[in-house]
Curated annotation (Swiss-Prot):
EC primary class: transferase
Keyword annotations: Glycoprotein, Glycosyltransferase, Golgi apparatus, Lipid metabolism, Membrane, Signal-anchor, Transferase, Transmembrane, Transmembrane helix
Gene giving rise to this polypeptide: FUT3
Segments on the Cytoplasmic side according to the record's topology features: 1-15
Source taxon at top rank: Eukaryota
Known glycosylation sites: 165, 196
GO cellular component, one term: Golgi cisterna membrane
Membrane-traversing stretches: 16-34
Lumenal-facing ranges: 35-372
Region (Disordered): 40-69
Protein name: 3-galactosyl-N-acetylglucosaminide 4-alpha-L-fucosyltransferase FUT3
Pfam families per the UniProt record, alphabetical: Glyco_tran_10_N (PF17039), Glyco_transf_10 (PF00852)
Post-translational modification: Glycosylated.
Length: 372
């Protein structure tokens, strides 16, 4: 008997019950773990859970954080500097709207890693196969044929068959269009001061360095100057000291923007810089009037083809010299447009933008067949 007189508790059956409950709890946990593991392994969403978890840390009502991976910076190799002369480069995001920056360099050590190589035709024109980048070409690397010269000045094009993936030139049908100049719209305050007609003390100017007697432009000039005084600057003509060209040409009412080669879209700095930036009305000899009108208003220039002879053109220019209202009509387009001239940095950034937009890989079968 218990000395206190109380009966002993029945401990054995309680211990069995506790052990049974513990085993049941362990079994439930184990099977739950197996189910979760199976769901995670198969990737199927579990009931009541999101397949993609929301971004944490964003305040209520704010837009979700952009989780799109950023594009890698493209590496572009300039196989040579244009005409072997280094030029200043700029951030492409500041040069071309919508473009991301590219790393552009002329360091050939990066050739194996470069996404693209820009090859300036003039710099490899003589014996091109020995001057092109070496083989084997890195997988996926694109080569860009870059040229601003007309077909007669481009030799050995046939040696470039199947080497290049993209074209880059003044031709508007190039993969990368790099004209010598263009007009851009503007609004608000005038982008330029009003034309000071009293400063236009001279009539017609022409600056020319490549003087060939048998060329179309020299022959036309020789016929024109028989009826009209033309001041010619350049080699074997009036000197034009460096840094004074714009100041000198701005004194003239008209400028002869005569191209040295007559080919579609070949409209050079003779018009965009020498004439328009000097506020002289360009008298053009080059591609057709309709070709010029793709890039300029019809009343922004005078085309030699509009006249039956150089004598008729001379008479027309003399009439405009005396009729201020008609002369000033050639500047009306400047109320809404302004001229811009090319830069090497901008051209390279256009290539940067094109490479970002166009990922397909193509091969030019024949540069010569396309360009000439």
């Amino acid at each position: 008997m218990d000395p206190l007189g109380a009966a002993k508790p029945q401990w054995p059956w309680r211990r069995c019950l506790a052990a049974l409950l513990f085993q049941l709890l362990v079994a439930v946990c184990f099977f739950s773990y197996l189910r979760v593991s199976r769901d995670d392994a198969t990737g199927s969403p579990r009931p009541g859970l999101m397949a993609v978890e929301p971004v944490t840390g964003a305040p209520s009502g704010s837009s979700r954080q952009d989780t799109t991976p950023t594009r890698p910076t493209l590496l572009i190799l300039l196989w040579t500097w244009p005409f072997h002369i280094p030029v200043a480069l700029s951030r492409c995001s500041e040069m071309v709207p919508g473009a991301a920056d590219c790393h552009i360099t002329a360091d050939r050590k990066v050739y194996p890693q470069a996404d693209a190589v820009i090859v300036h035709h003039w710099d490899i024109m003589y014996n091109p196969k020995s001057r092109l980048p070496p083989s084997p070409r890195p997988q996926g690397q694109r080569w860009i044929w870059f040229n601003l010269e007309p077909p007669p000045n481009c030799q050995h094009l046939e040696a470039l068959d199947r080497y290049f993936n993209l074209t880059m030139s003044y031709r508007s049908d190039s993969d990368i269009f790099t004209p010598y100049g263009w007009l851009e719209p503007w609004s608000g305050q005038p982008a330029h001061p009003p034309l000071n007609l009293s400063a236009k003390t001279e009539l017609v100017a022409w600056a020319v360095s490549n003087w060939k007697l048998d060329s179309a432009r020299v022959r036309y000039y020789q016929s024109l100057q028989a009826h009209l005084k033309v001041d010619v600057y350049g080699r074997s003509h009036k000197p034009l000291p460096k840094g004074t060209m714009m100041e000198t040409l701005s004194r003239y009412k008209f400028y002869l923007a005569f191209e040295n080669s007559l080919h579609p879209d070949y409209i050079t700095e003779k018009l965009w810089r020498n004439a328009l930036e000097a506020w002289a009305v360009p008298v053009v000899l080059g591609p057709s009037r309709s070709n010029y009108e793709r890039f300029l208003p019809p009343d922004a220039f005078i085309h030699v083809d509009d006249f039956q002879s150089p004598k008729d053109l001379a008479r027309y220019l003399q009439e405009l010299d005396k009729d201020h209202a008609r002369y000033l009509s050639y500047f009306r387009w400047r109320e809404t447009l302004r001229p811009r001239s090319f830069s090497w940095a901008l051209d390279f950034c256009k290539a940067c933008w094109k490479l970002q937009q166009e990922s397909r890989y193509q091969t030019m079968r024949s540069i010569a067949a396309w360009f000439t």
